[in-house]
Regions:
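Short S/T/G/P-rich N-terminal loop/turn motif that feeds into the first structured element of a domain
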Residues: 1-70, 74-90
């Protein structure tokens, strides 16, 4: 199992969350088995997203999807702030 943590800034959390929630079916189809969203206690527009996948290949493939990049842009993600980190279950 691989878990991806993505720290990033968004222009407006509420607008971002609507787009994120509307992408749930694509997440499942892309291999996401579990997800969670966290907000910074000091900056409500800084979010940490956790997605779990069955394999590293699924995780990398999901993050390369053009529709994911498009959804991120539509949601107001500051793509320059993206910090994906991949972790394997120990």
């Amino acid at each position: 199992m691989t878990t991806v943590f993505m720290l990033h800034r968004v222009a407006d959390y509420d607008a971002w969350r609507r787009v994120y929630d509307s992408f749930a079916d694509a997440q499942r189809q892309g291999g996401v088995t579990s997800q969670a969203v966290y907000r910074s206690e000091t900056d409500s527009n800084t979010v940490l997203v956790m997605h779990a996948f069955g394999s590293s290949e699924e995780a990398h493939s999901f993050l390369e999807r053009p529709d994911l990049r498009e959804a991120m842009q539509d949601a107001g993600v500051d793509v320059g702030s993206l910090r994906p980190e991949f972790y394997a279950e120990a």
